[in-house]
Structures are given as C-alpha cells and as structure tokens.
Amino acid sequence: MVTTVEMLTTWNPVTVSLVSPVIIYWVASAFFGFLHYIELPVFEKYRIHPPEEIARRNRVPQMAVVKAVLFQQLCEVVVGIALAMFEGYPEPIDEAKQMLRYEAFFSKNLPALLQVAPFAPKLAYNFIVPAFQYFFAFFIIDSWQYFWHRYLHYNKKLYNMIHAHHHRLQVPYAMGALYNHPFEGLILDTFGAGVAYLAAGLSPQQAVIFFTLSTLKTVDDHCGYVFPYDPLQMFFANNARYHDLHHQPYGFQKNFSQPFFTFWDHVLGTYMPPKSETPYEKKQKAKNAKKVN
C-alpha cells in the first residue's frame, strides 16, 4: 500500500502529471519568447502582429503576467494533489488480465471479427480505447471551457470583474496564455482539466499526456506565430490565428472555443473564420508598396 506521502514524493505518473504541465509551459514560452526577441526574418514572416504592438496594445507589465501565471500553476498543483489524495495511488495495471477481459468481450459479442482479425482485442486495448478516451477528454474540456468562457463574456459584471484580466493582452503572446483572474484560472483551466480527466477515466499515465498536451496547446494558441509545419496548428483548426481573432475588438464575441476544436462555435453561431492576411502581413505589404512608390 503506497501512502500519500510516498505518492507525492517519488517520481511516478501522479507526480509527473503535476509537474510536466508547469515545465512544458515555461519551456514553450521561453522558446517563443526567444523567437520574438531575436526577430529573425525567417521566423518574422510568420508573425500575426508586428512586434511593437505587444508593447503598445497590451496593458500588463510582463512581471505581472509572470506572477499571475505562477499563482495559477500553484493552484493547479494544489488541486492536483487534493485529487490525488482523494483517488489514492492507482493499483498497477495487470495487462494480461486486461487482455483476457478484452478477448472475452470479443469472443462473446464479436466472434466473427475475432476470427478474421485475431489481433482486434490487442488493437482495441492499446490504441482504439485510449484514442476514444483522449477524444472524449478533449470534447469534455472544450465543452466546459466554451460555455464558461461564453458566459463570462455575456455577463458584463463577471466580465469586468474576472475575464477582463485576460483581455488586457490584446496581442496574445506565449507567456501570457495563462494570464487570468485566479477565479477564472481555477474554474476554466484547473477544474475543466480535472473534470475531463475524471469523465474520460484516464489513467495517471494518460493524464500526463493529456495535461501536458492541453498546456502546450494553450501556449501555442497564444504564441503569436502561424508556422506552416506546427503540428498543433496543422491538425487543429482552433489555433493561434483562430484564437487571436477573439482577442481583437472585432472578434470579441466570437471564437469562444478552446483549446482543441471549433465545434461549439460552429454549432452555436459564434464562429469567425481567420482572415486571409494577418496584421503583420498587411504591414509588410504596405512597407513594400511605399518602397516601390
């Protein structure tokens, strides 16, 4: 029997799931921050906004952003510890026993498939069921965040008290992805991820991937760049350009979906398609036109 102290003071999937999102947040933020600092032309052409707009349009000092993000991450770790204590340390998975259960299920319900594809139980156990769990977790966290996010916009009092904090950053950048009012960070991000984890029945190992990917996706959505071969922007329509529109005055009541899909925006009429040109591209075209003239 593993005690709570042992669970939280040894390197195991539970502690990794608490620490890895914090690490990936600052590593990814540092990477995009470095690109912003060096301003190499090979990367600059993929900017969404000209660099001077970050200082001109954002109304929060970067040190205040750092403090707010660290506080939210502290809250996330505390809630994660509480959840781990409530659940207890998970028993080791007996894969042989699990495979016997899958084989018994296929033998009883899908005997014809088992004859044609004897590998079906193993495929289901290793790939199909985990993939469904992840997809369901994505759907749950998206649904949770969409409706809370939209409510915080439509309720003017709550917007001014809470969500307006995040919109002080009119030009998103990576490090500011989790710059929120503490209440918003707790309800939308921390509780949203926790509810999705529980609803999908993720294992601690799966939780490491889910929490880390969700955090990386959030940073990438605020990074301020549209890189052509960024896998997170290639495979998800809900990306940096899409979310940037929500931070602009003309897209303020659109594109509430986050962090993975755009499903609810399409269904409920709050979808705004990304524009063909970014503000940075428009500025560069104007510069080139002046040079020609």
From Swiss-Prot:
Main location per the UniProt record: endoplasmic reticulum
Domain of life: Eukaryota
GO cellular component entries: endoplasmic reticulum; endoplasmic reticulum membrane
Major enzyme class: oxidoreductase
Transmembrane segments: 18-38, 68-88, 127-147
Pathway this chain belongs to: Membrane lipid metabolism; sphingolipid biosynthesis
Any GO molecular function: sphingolipid delta-4 desaturase activity
Organism classification: Eukaryota, Fungi, Dikarya, Ascomycota, Taphrinomycotina
E.C. code: 1.-.-.-
Designated name of the protein: Sphingolipid C4-hydroxylase sur2
Subcellular location field: Endoplasmic reticulum membrane
Protein role: Involved in the response to syringomycin.
Family the entry assigns: Belongs to the sterol desaturase family.
InterPro entries, alphabetized: Fatty_acid_hydroxylase (IPR006694), Sterol_Desaturase_Related (IPR050307)
